[in-house]
């Protein structure tokens, strides 16, 4: 079967207005991060599979292929681990504030509706153990969304240590842990009730309430503190309160104590961004203090934020924010011996472009088709208007 007119699953073409909007959003985001003092970093699209083996092998969402030496390589499925590789192998001095943008690739299942190719941008704050790193990440995300004029967005906080603490105290085998993870992610009330019956513990009240522990930050955090005496969970809740107090002036903040990230490297505060016009989150991040241990014997505190720029482009389009490209108002048809004069006229005239047609008639036909109001003919010794819409 010849597939030369088809696209691989989960990929798509972007034309004209959408392509320009995607490019402009990426520029805006990078400019905003640079203004906040982040240093840009770029990593290859192709990496050895070992860079991602601990996080992605189980879910098999990698695009794998062999290089010319028979080594297994992949298209990067995220940016965080490659940046961890760079930081741990180049000897750069910490702490660091890094920013990035580029393509990521995930081999999702067919018919799932997910995009396998995504444009992602984000930041990594490495070497700062202070909670100010989380605050900076969240405020940077809020600032970007405001700069992009995303309407009615909300930031949702969670804490990876809550789920980790529950799993640790329950001491579940791997298969049971995976089942429990799905119950929490799906907020299955009946499923969790059955789980608690089969796995009783001192956390029963807290676990039973987890599917409902989401909503207004202050209310939910206060409610959660009354459901447990476990010091680990209480410490995480207090940390969330500190973050909420620090950033709630900038945006609407909610919490979800059953928030579980797909990547297992998160260790502390986690967060997501939602909006009324978006079906899913377009912003995610959190703290992962053991990230560098995959590449070196030492660890370093780190917090990161990632933005799905394709989703943000769609959001802008739905909100009517994407501006139309300034239309061409002058088409310059020229004789070959008058290219210098034509080029000079184009450089001096805003919203003008050169005609590539052999005859003035074809140039005028093109102008009518694309609603260009004026066409001039540049000869070596003259410039003549040969079409003007009002005089048609």
From Swiss-Prot:
UniProt keyword terms in alphabetical order: Amino-acid biosynthesis, Cytoplasm, Histidine biosynthesis
Gene Ontology molecular function, alphabetical: catalytic activity, acting on a protein; histidine-tRNA ligase activity; transferase activity
UniProt pathway: Amino-acid biosynthesis; L-histidine biosynthesis; L-histidine from 5-phospho-alpha-D-ribose 1-diphosphate: step 1/9
Example GO biological process: L-histidine biosynthetic process
SUPFAM superfamilies: Class II aaRS and biotin synthetases
One protein family per Pfam: tRNA-synt_His
Record's function text: Required for the first step of histidine biosynthesis. May allow the feedback regulation of ATP phosphoribosyltransferase activity by histidine.
UniProt family annotation: Belongs to the class-II aminoacyl-tRNA synthetase family. HisZ subfamily.
Name of the molecule in the record: ATP phosphoribosyltransferase regulatory subunit
Naturally occurring in which organism (per UniProt): Listeria innocua serovar 6a (strain ATCC BAA-680 / CLIP 11262)
Gene name linked to the record: hisZ
């Amino acid at each position: 079967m010849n597939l030369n007119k088809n696209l691989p699953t989960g990929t798509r073409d972007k034309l004209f207005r959408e392509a320009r909007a995607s490019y402009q959003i990426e520029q805006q985001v990078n400019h905003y991060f640079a203004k906040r003092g982040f240093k840009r970093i770029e990593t290859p699209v192709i990496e050895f599979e070992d860079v991602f083996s601990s996080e992605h092998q189980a879910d098999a969402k990698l695009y794998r292929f062999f290089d010319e030496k028979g080594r297994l390589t992949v298209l990067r499925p995220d940016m965080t681990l490659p940046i961890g590789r760079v930081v741990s192998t180049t000897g750069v001095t910490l702490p660091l504030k890094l920013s990035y943008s580029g393509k990521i690739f995930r081999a999702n299942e067919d018919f799932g509706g997910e995009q396998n190719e995504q444009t992602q941008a984000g930041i990594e704050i490495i070497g700062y153990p202070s909670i100010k790193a989380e605050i900076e990440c969240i405020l940077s995300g809020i600032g970007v969304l405001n700069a992009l004029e995303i309407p009615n967005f909300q930031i949702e906080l969670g804490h990876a240590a809550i789920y980790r603490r529950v799993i640790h105290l329950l001491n579940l085998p791997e298969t049971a842990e995976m089942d429990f993870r799905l119950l929490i992610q799906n907020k299955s009330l009946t499923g969790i009730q059955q789980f608690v019956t089969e796995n009783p513990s001192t956390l029963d009240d807290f676990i039973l309430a987890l599917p409902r522990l989401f909503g207004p930050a202050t209310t939910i955090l206060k409610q959660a503190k009354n459901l447990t005496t476990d010091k680990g969970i209480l410490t995480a809740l207090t940390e969330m309160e500190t973050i909420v107090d620090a950033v709630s002036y900038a945006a609407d903040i909610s919490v979800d104590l059953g928030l579980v990230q797909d990547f297992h490297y998160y260790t502390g505060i986690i967060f997501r961004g939602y909006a009324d016009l978006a079906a899913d989150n377009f912003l995610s991040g959190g703290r992962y203090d053991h990230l560098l241990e995959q590449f070196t014997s030492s660890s370093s505190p780190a917090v990161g934020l990632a933005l799905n720029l394709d989703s943000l482009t769609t959001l802008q389009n739905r909100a009517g924010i994407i501006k139309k490209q300034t239309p061409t108002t002058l088409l310059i048809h020229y004789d070959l011996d008058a290219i210098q004069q034509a080029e000079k006229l184009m450089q001096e005239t805003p919203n003008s472009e050169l005609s590539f047609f052999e005859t003035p008639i074809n140039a005028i036909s093109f102008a009518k088709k694309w609603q260009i109001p004026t066409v001039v003919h540049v000869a070596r010794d003259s410039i003549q208007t040969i079409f003007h819409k009002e005089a048609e």
